[in-house]
C-alpha cells in the first residue's frame, strides 16, 4: 500500500480534547452548546440545529467549531463541554464509542445506538434526518461505461490494473475497513493508495486515480459526474445521520425535543449532496447554506412531529 498522507494519531486527538476547548467553560449548565466539525456536512447540520433553536426560542446557542472526529466530540460531551451534536452517524458510533459489531440493517443500527447511547452515556439519539452518508466506492462515468461497472464486486477484474485511492482513516478501521473488505470481497488491489479524504474526489476526476472510496453524500459526486458502485456484498454498515443531545439539556429545555424532531426525514441523500456542493464547491458559507435551506422550508413551522417519537423521548428524559 502506498500512503500519501497519514491520519492524525488517535492519541493526539485524545490529548487535544483533554484540554479546555476554546471559548467554552468546563460547565454547560446555562447554555446550549452545539458541536460542529471540520468538514462541510457536519458544519451545515450544526448550523441547521443552531438556527432552528434560535428561530423557535429565545435560548442562547453557542457552537464549538472544527471538532475533528467523532471521538473528540464524544469526549467533549463526556467532559460536559457541549450538549448537542448536529450530526452523528449510526455506523461510526456503533464501531467507535460503543465498540459494537457493525450492523448493515439501518433499523437495527438505529435501535442499537438509540438504546445504548441512553444506557451508557445518558444521551438521546434522535430519528434520522433522512440520509445515509456511508462509505462508497466510486468511479468516473466514462470509466464505468468502459469497464461495465455498477457493483463493487466487479472491481475484481481490475484489481491488478486500477489505481485505487481511499480515505486514510478507513484503512485500519475495525469491522468495515480494508481487512474486512478483503475478507468480504475476496480480493485486494495491487495499486492501493491511502490519502486524505478531501483529496480522493479531485484525484479521481483528474485521472490520477481510477477508483476511490469516498462519502456517498459528498457534493463533488455530482460536480465531477461520478458513479457510485453498489456495495453488493453489504460490507458497509448503515451510516444514518441524526442529531444527538444530552438528557440533561433536554430536561432543562424540553422544547428542544420538538424542535429536533421537526428535522426527522427532512434531508434526503440527494439534498445533502446539494447542500454539501454549495459549501464545498460553490464556496457558500455553511451558515448561509443552512439559512437558505431553512427559509425554503419555512423552518418546518407547519411540520407535525412524530407523536410516538415525542412520547418516547419525553419518557426517556422524564419530562411532560
Q: Can you annotate each of these PLM segments?
A:
Residues 96-107, 111-126, 208, 220-234:
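Ligand-binding "clamshell"
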Residues 41, 173, 177, 182-187, ...:
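An extracytoplasmic/periplasmic, membrane-proximal ligand-sensing/linker region
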Residues 69-70, 80-93, 109-110, 140, ...:
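Beta->alpha turn/N-cap motifs
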Residues 15-18:
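C-terminal motif of bacterial Sec signal peptides marking the signal peptidase cleavage site
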Residues 31-62, 67, 130-201, 284-288:
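Bilobed "Venus flytrap"/periplasmic-binding protein-like clamshell domains
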Residues 83-86, 164-232, 319:
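Ligand-binding pocket segment of bilobal, Venus flytrap-like solute-binding proteins
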Residues 20-34, 153-163, 300-319:
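Immediate post-signal peptide segment of exported/extracytoplasmic ligand-binding proteins
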Residues 134-145, 239-253:
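A bilobed periplasmic-binding-protein/Venus flytrap-type ligand-binding module shared by bacterial periplasmic
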Amino acid at each position: 500500500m502506498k500512503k500519501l498522507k497519514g491520519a492524525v494519531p488517535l492519541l493526539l486527538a485524545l490529548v487535544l480534547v483533554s484540554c479546555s476547548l476554546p471559548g467554552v467553560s468546563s460547565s454547560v449548565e446555562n447554555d446550549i452548546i452545539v458541536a460542529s466539525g471540520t468538514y462541510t456536512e457536519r458544519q451545515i447540520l450544526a448550523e441547521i440545529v443552531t438556527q432552528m433553536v434560535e428561530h423557535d426560542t429565545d435560548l442562547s446557542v453557542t457552537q464549538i467549531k472544527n471538532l475533528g472526529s467523532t471521538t473528540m466530540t464524544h469526549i467533549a460531551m463526556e467532559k460536559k463541554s457541549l450538549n448537542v451534536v448536529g450530526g452523528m452517524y449510526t455506523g461510526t458510533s456503533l464501531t467507535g464509542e460503543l465498540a459494537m459489531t457493525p450492523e448493515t440493517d439501518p433499523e437495527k443500527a438505529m435501535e442499537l445506538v438509540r438504546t445504548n447511547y441512553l444506557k451508557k452515556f445518558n444521551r438521546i439519539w434522535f430519528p434520522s434526518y433522512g440520509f445515509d452518508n456511508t462509505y462508497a466506492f466510486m468511479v468516473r462515468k466514462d470509466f464505468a461505461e468502459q469497464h461495465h461497472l455498477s457493483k463493487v464486486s466487479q472491481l475484481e477484474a481490475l484489481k491488478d490494473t486500477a489505481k485505487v485511492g481511499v480515505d486514510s482513516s478507513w484503512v485500519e478501521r475495525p469491522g468495515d475497513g480494508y481487512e474486512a473488505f478483503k475478507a468480504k470481497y475476496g480480493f485486494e488491489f495491487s495499486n492501493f493508495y491511502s490519502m486524505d479524504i478531501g483529496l480522493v474526489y479531485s484525484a479521481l476526476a483528474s485521472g490520477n486515480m481510477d477508483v476511490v472510496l469516498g462519502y456517498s453524500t459528498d457534493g463533488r459526486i455530482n460536480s465531477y459526474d461520478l458513479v457510485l458502485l453498489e456495495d453488493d456484498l453489504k460490507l458497509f454498515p448503515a451510516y444514518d445521520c441524526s442529531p444527538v443531545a444530552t438528557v440533561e439539556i433536554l430536561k432543562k429545555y424540553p422544547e428542544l425535543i420538538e424542535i429536533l424532531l421537526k428535522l426527522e426525514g427532512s434531508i434526503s441523500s440527494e439534498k445533502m449532496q446539494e447542500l454539501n456542493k454549495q459549501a464545498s464547491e460553490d464556496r457558500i458559507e455553511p451558515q448561509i447554506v443552512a439559512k437558505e435551506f431553512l427559509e425554503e422550508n419555512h423552518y418546518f413551522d407547519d411540520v407535525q412531529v412524530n407523536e410516538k417519537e415525542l412520547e418516547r423521548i419525553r419518557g426517556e428524559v422524564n419530562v411532560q
